[in-house]
Structures are given as C-alpha cells and as structure tokens.
Amino acid sequence: MGSAATSPPPSMKLAQEDLKRVAAHMGGAAASPPPSVKLTQEDLKRVAAHRAVEFVEPGMALGLGTGSTAAHALDRLGDLLRAGALPGVAGVPTSLKTELHATRVGIPLLPLGGDGGPSRIHLSIDGADEVDPDLNLVKGRGGSLLREKMIEGAGEKFVVIVDESKLVPRLGCTGAVPVEVIPFGAPHTLGLIRKVFDGLPGFHARLRMVRKDAEEDTPFVTDNGNYIVEMFFEDGIRGDLHNISDQLLRITGVVEHGMFLSMATTVIVANKDGTITVMDKKN
C-alpha cells in the first residue's frame, strides 16, 4: 500500500471522545497527546479499533475479526450503521462469537463464497497476538485462527489493530503459537509437530486443555470441531518462517497454524503514551 491508501474518507473521522484522548498521525510517526491523558489498555484498543474503522467505505464487504480489540471495531461499525453513515456495508464473521456480536450491534452478515457471499472482501479488520518488524503476525490464541486466515486471506486489504505490547522482535516471543489439528490421532499429530523442532532448546508443545466446572481437563474445541496444539519457544521462532510454515502444513492432521505471514497490509498501533502509529506493508 502507498501512503494514499492510509488516508480515510472525510466522513469516517474518529469519534469526538477519541479525538480528545489521542491525536493520530500517519506514516509511522506518533503525535503527542496532552500530558494529563492516562489511557488504559482497553482505551488503547478502542482508539486503534476506531482508527481502523475509518478505512471502511459505504458498500464494502468486510472481514469481521475476533477478540477483545476487534470487538471495539464491531461496536463502532454498529454505531455508524445505525447512524446511516455506512450504507451497504456487511461483514463475514471469523467466529461464532463474532457472528453473535455483529448480529447484536446490527451488522448485516454474509457467508464466505457461495451464492449469498460477496464477490470479494474489500477489507478485514482484526487484532493480533504478536506483530514482528515485517508485519508478520501470530493470531489465534483464542482459537479462531482457521476462519480468520480463510477470511482475511481472501480480502484485498487486512488492517490489524493492536496496542504496543503486541510488538515483538520475533514471532513466538510472548506466548503460544497455535496449530489447529483434527481430533483423530491428535497425540500422534502432536508428536509430528514436535519433530519439526526436535533439538531446539526451550521448545515444547502441548494440546490446549480446558476445565468445565469440576470436571476433568478436556481438549479445547474450536468452532470447526478441531483441537489446538500450543507451541512455545524460549526466545521466539528463529529461521525462515515460510519454510517452518510449509513443514507444519505438510503434516497430515494439521489443519492450519497461527502464523499469518505477509498478510497484513496495515498495522495500527496504539502506544501506551496515547499516540497512534500506522505501519504499512512494504511493496
């Protein structure tokens, strides 16, 4: 994307309450807010999400992300739709949770493909668990990585909204890198995933487990009826990410992984000092 792509239409300005809290500045530099402003992490998520919604234009088909940051974008879209500011806008949800949220705030929904689906997805807006210097992402710690990657990979533009705690030098630095696997033979698939990183110091992988009430731990189940393997790295993933991606996807039983490589076109970062940084994908 060039610099022109980061200029929102005049009608999509931030809400006044957000303008009072933070001054946005495009192109990677950050504007200074009043020194008295104190923003919580939720405030930062909200400001970044509202900034991303400025990219939405009437008639667009959107990819609707999942997670706490994306939820703020859904709320903002609902407000604008009810105000009549975004006629013809509809979205494809990346999870059942997002489907319910979007329905609640009045966002019309579309399927991905088929007779009722859009001919194209113009723009997707979603959060991320990690963003590296090349705008590669880790996503899906909430378990929605497969639908997220399908929908966001089908779009023309993918705007990612994060606070600065999500910026990392390497993917895998701050927590699990998820891999969605089919339930049949999941322990076997887990063993094959471990072999990809055999001998790597500090690496370990496990099935994500959940406990319901006082019952025993059971595998976490995604919206697609699959399990999640969590991969942990002592100091992040080193090496060729695309090669590692290929090795994982060649394992029979692996459905998809949570490394979103070369997919984000714009990343909007809300900094803890109240400034916003917008980073565009290099051509």
What is each residue range found by the language model?
Residues 47-57:
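Conserved alpha-helix/loop element of class I SAM-dependent methyltransferases that forms part
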Residues 52, 64-67, 91, 138, ...:
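Buried hydrophobic positions in well-ordered alpha/beta secondary-structure cores of metabolic enzymes
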